[in-house]
Amino acid sequence: MQTLLDIEEIKQLKARYFRGIDTCNLELLKTVLADAVHIRFDSPTYQYEINGIDEAMNFYRNAFTHRRFGMHHGHTPEIRVDGDTATGIWYLNDLFINLDEQTILTGSALYEDCYTRVAGQWRVQRTGYKRLL
């Protein structure tokens, strides 16, 4: 039963991650990510590697604004829990609009995450995606 509760908590954690990005809510994002978070985004047209909560907050602060915004839908999670750690694979469908560059990106990717339980709360320890299209 505990494993099912942990999986549900991790699903809600990932939902808050996407909502934090899409609403530019850095305070919410900070509650989702571990202090030593590692993030990697891999696409044919860009690559980002981010280490630590401060670098992550700076990245999201600059990447998503009132002129650069997105919609992230994560679904069909595959989550495995092992005590106070867990892994997850999620499909992503997203849309990113950049008014400054007058571009729209839409596509899909596979997120691969590692989670850790800190003081009784799940946090994203490592996250990132590889673009599928």
Predicted feature locations:
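Short, low-complexity N-terminal intrinsically disordered segments enriched in polar/charged residues
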Residues: M1-T23, E27-T31, D35
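A solvent-exposed, acidic/Ser-Thr-rich amphipathic alpha-helical stretch
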Residues: L26-Y91
